[in-house]
Amino acid sequence: MRYPPFKTILFSSVLIMALGCCRIVGTAMAEGPSFDCGKASGSIEEMICNDDELSALDRKLTDVYARATIKAINEHPPVLKVEQRGWIKGRNDCWKSKDPRSCTESNYRLRIAELQARYRLVPENGPFGYFCNDKPRDEVVVTFFQTDPPTLIAERGDQVSLMYLQPSSSGSKYQGRNESFWEHHGEAIVVWGYGNPEMRCRKR
């Protein structure tokens, strides 16, 4: 019986070991967050490094942010980068929360949905116009986005509001920073601005 040369056996063994190491490193990179865990700063980043789900959300946000950056290349002023730095600071402040993990997860999901909607990175439905208070010129234009959680962008004149779907006993209710949109059977109750009264709006 003839056996392969010793050098061939040695080379094959080294190659198999190298490929195995590459798989291990590749898997580790795929499972970890987008940032270097060796340089993790603070308890929140350390938690992300040790949590597969949070690491996956971090990688997803990095991908979504990169795609948004391409869309925002002509944005003036260039606010996206500044906003992202502020978001990271806010995420890291989740250590102050009663439930830091829940706070961190929520921050990721809302930020991902926000960027996907604002920069039109996911399928959308609309726009739809709603006339409010029986005044044809008082119109709210709404576009819905297939994000998680679902979002909409409402426009009224030169003002824009991003809103997230909220639990509701009937209809679809979305809430933004100071605005809300509650639709039921083609009619909507809209609040636009802090402390302002409800507007009754009909779909155009």
Short names for language-model regions:
Residues 2-14, 21:
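Bacterial N-terminal signal peptides that target proteins for export
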Residues 28-204:
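N-terminal alpha-helical modules
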Residues 1-2, 30:
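Compositionally biased, intrinsically disordered/low-complexity regions enriched for serine, proline
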Residues 17-27:
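C-terminal segment of classical bacterial N-terminal signal peptides
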